[in-house]
Structure formats: C-alpha cells, structure tokens
Amino acid sequence: MNTFFLDRLNSEPHALAFAGQSTPWPLALADQSANPALDEALHTHAAAAQALLYPVSAELLATTGRPVDLFGFEPNPARLGAAAAASASVPGIALTQLGALLDAAALGYNPAQAKPVAVLGHSQGVLAVHMTRAIEAAGSIEAAG
C-alpha cells in the first residue's frame, strides 16, 4: 500500500518542527516561489504585512536604511549574507514558514484537523508555532487569514 505522506499525517500522531535563524530561508523562499500559486500567495501576504506596517514605515526605513525586498536575496545554501540581518531574516523566515504551511495546506494537510501532538520551533521557528496555533484556532489556514 502506497500512502501519501501528508495523508498519513492527517491520521497518525506526529509533531511539527520549525527551524530558526540559521535556516537558508532565501533558498526555501526561491523554491516556494517556483510554484506560481504559492508565489502569488506569498507576495499577497508580504504586501499585506507591508500595509500593516505602513504607519511605522518611516521608522523602519530609518532603522534599515532601505526597503527590504524579501524576494530579492540570493538563494545561496552556503551563505546567508545580508539575508542574515534581523531586518530581513525575521520577516523572511516567517514568510518562508508561512509558505511551508500554505504548501502543505494545498496538498491536503490542515493542522486543525490533523492535530499534531507537538508543534516546536527553535529560535525564529517559534513564529511558525504561533502561525500553526492560529490555524488550529481558526479551523483552517484560509480562516486564519
């Protein structure tokens, strides 16, 4: 019997674990962006985040010195470079984690229904823990917004 992995997660005990700062997130984001539907969703979420931050955009610009384009970093698996700076890595890792959750949802995995026995995050991985908890509370990734 050949059972799709995410189908098994929907019915078997499992844990979700999310990595943090050392994650080569630009590479993961580039991989996710190769899927046109996922790329559109990620750009939509990034734009929504920018809209929420608009009231403090001048302060953010004063801190970073320039706008941060999360999709503009080189996808290098060996070196993060400028993508390691907190002004890029915090939103970049969060967006990439959201991308993983969106991709899993498109493949039929819903943590609200699958009920993982644990959701763990190391360092910035805790952001995805909060995303997963929001999905569980809302019932689906779509309802969580």
Identify the residue ranges that each predicted region occupies.
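FabD-like malonyl-/acyl-CoA
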Residues: 2-145
